[in-house]
Each structure stands twice: as structure tokens, then as C-alpha cells.
Amino acid sequence: MENVVIIDGIRTPMGRSKGGAFRQVRAEDLSAHLMKKLFKRNPAIQQHEIDDIYWGCVQQTLEQGFNIARNAALLADIPHSVPAVTVNRLCGSSMQALHDGARMIMTGEANVTLIGGVEHMGHVPMTHGVDFHPKMSLSVAKAAGVMGLTAEMLAKIHHISREMQDEFALRSHQRATQATQSGAFANEISPIYGHDADGILKRFDYDEVIRSDANLKDLAALRPVFDPVTGSVTAGSSSALSDGASAMLITSESYAKNLGLKPRARIRSMAAVGCDPSIMGYGPVPATQMALKKAGLVLGDIGVIELNEAFAAQSLACLKGLNLLDSMDDKVNLNGGAIALGHPLGCSGARITTTLLNLMERRDVQFGLATMCIGLGQGIATIIERMD
């Protein structure tokens, strides 16, 4: 079976969904921008050599409908001969796109795939047009469809206090602020034009969602939003609503060698699992365990971890379940996470994998893990290995 290598990964800045930078930029344009940029950064790979495009997106309607992968590819002037498909595993969609593209290469069906994802949550809200089957409640708790209530459940089961959640949320903003100021995001962000608060067109090369002024006092003052009476999950300890896209170029190792490319990492293992929808946020735990088993590794072998922060309560429950609380500050979400950057659903999987790749290079570690929870009870994980 062919080894799959990552040639490059980039993302857009994360724009605030409510009146943010991309309020006049469409999801297809965010996607096409990255498709074009990847080939400018990697001119040795010709666009006509792409065997397929896999693009994650959750709300496939309005501007994100009718196969946004193909629409974006056409906007990016990618040759018409290159096919494209939109992938939906909810929050894990662009990581699933990575897995789908990788499997095509592993089986010899492809040499090069372009993968990524997008979500414009300002233009296409998360619940737009959603209509759950009435009989679903016969087998699944009604509250399982409300992500914030699943986080509340995890907080209760794993004894995650309000104070722990607020501290974790603050850490996310502080880490993301430090990463921005130090230039840690520079290699992964592909600047793009949007509009500032005054409606003036400007070039954005930073994430506008991060709150550099976040503090515990303000976080503690927020009221629980999902369970106002006995809850502890607030807007401040939940992932921000944001708009963004991410993209990666992956190839077979033999193709990269023949073309004289210098791959940045090798995909060691991939895993997707199911779990109880009522505790959907715990999915990264069994997904990580499965990915480690497939890779023949133990968690101690992993030098850097990107865990998508859907909620602080959910993230802390996973870290507790993986025995990572004590090593969190040395390994996990070192540049902050979705609480600070936001969680554009179809974008996040490839986004955290790209951030992971850059962190591994900066910290000179061999193995890295990207993992995330998925609404309605799933988890997904990818382990990558740096290449010299």
C-alpha cells in the first residue's frame, strides 16, 4: 500500500460570523482562494494532475449547496477534467476529506488529491433547514441534538467545574493571541480581502475572532446559555461562530519523490468512531485510541496534539479521559483552539491538521495527533509523522 504524504496546508483567517470580515465574501470564494494559493506555493504540481478534490462542508445549501467542491474548483480555474466531491461528517468533514483523499492514494487510485473544507456560518447558519425525524427521540435523547447540552452532560459526568471551563477558555484566547503576535500562524494563513467594521475593503492576514482582552472576570460574569438553571457552559466557554476555509495537498510518497518534492509529513493512521450522541464531545477519546492502535504507538509517543475545542467542558472531559490534563500545557492546543478561533464546521478538520503540522515543525517533534468530536456522537482522529 502506498504511503501518503502531506505536501502543504493553508487556511484563511477566521472571520467573525456576525458582521465580520467575510460578510460580503462567499464560501465558494474562500475555498477557491485557497485552491489557487496552494498551487502558487507548490508550482511543481500541475493542476491537471489532481486526481480528485475532496471538500468538507456541513450545511450544503444556499451558497454552500449543489456540490460546493465543484463550484469552488471551477471558480479557481482548475481544469474541468478534475472531479470534485463535497464531504459531510458534520464537524469532522474536512478531516474526513483528508481521510478520503488519503485512502484513494493508499489504494493506488490516485497520486494527488486536493482536500479541504469550508463553512460560512454567517451566511448559512448551523441549523438552517434542519428537520430531525420525530421518531429519533425513541432511540436518542432529544437533547442530543443540542450540542451545548451534550457538553453540559460531559461536565456533570466528569466533574468539570465552571471555573475549569473559564480557565480553559481564557487559555485558548491567550495562546491564540501569543501565536498571532509571534507570527506562529504566518505560514498557515493565506491573507484574503474582506471588509472591516466600517465597510472598508482591506487585506486580512489575522484571525479577527480572537479576544486578546479576554479575562476571567468577564468570563465568570457570563450566564449559562444552554441550561440556565443548573448549567455551567457559557458562550465564553463554547467555540466561537466563525467563517473560514482550509486546504491541503497530499500525494503518494513515490509521486513526491519522482517530482523532487519535499513532503512535510506522512500520514501514519486515521480513525473514525461512533459514541453515544448524548456525550458526542467524548468522541476524540475512542478515536484517538483507535488511531494509536493502528499506528502501533502509545499516547506518550505523540509530541503535539490538536484537539478541536467545541466546548471547554468537552475538551477537558477528553483530556481527562486520555490522562492529558497534567501535560496539557506542554502538548495540547499550544496555539489556542476553536474557543478563540471559532469552529467553521466544514473547515476545522483540515485547519487543526495544518496547525498541527506547523507546530510539529516549530517544536521538532516526530509524531502529532489531530482529533475532534462530531455532532450526533462520533469522533475522528489523524496521526501524522514528520519527514526530514
Swiss-Prot record:
The keyword Cytoplasm applies. SUPFAM superfamilies: Thiolase-like. Catalyzes the final step of fatty acid oxidation in which acetyl-CoA is released and the CoA ester of a fatty acid two carbons shorter is formed. GO terms for molecular function: acetyl-CoA C-acyltransferase activity. It holds the Pfam family Thiolase_C. It is an enzyme of class 2 (transferase). The keyword Metal-binding does not apply. It catalyses: an acyl-CoA + acetyl-CoA = a 3-oxoacyl-CoA + CoA. Pathway: Lipid metabolism; fatty acid beta-oxidation. Belongs to the thiolase-like superfamily. Thiolase family. One of its GO terms (biological process) is phenylacetate catabolic process. The active site is at C91, H343, C373. GO terms for cellular component: cytoplasm. Coiled coil: none annotated. Heterotetramer of two alpha chains (FadB) and two beta chains (FadA). It is found in: Cytoplasm. Keywords: Acyltransferase, Cytoplasm, Fatty acid metabolism, Lipid degradation, Lipid metabolism, Transferase. Its EC number is 2.3.1.16. Its main location: cytoplasm. NCBIfam families: AcCoA-C-Actrans (TIGR01930), fadA (TIGR02445), PRK08947.1 (NF006510). This is 3-ketoacyl-CoA thiolase.
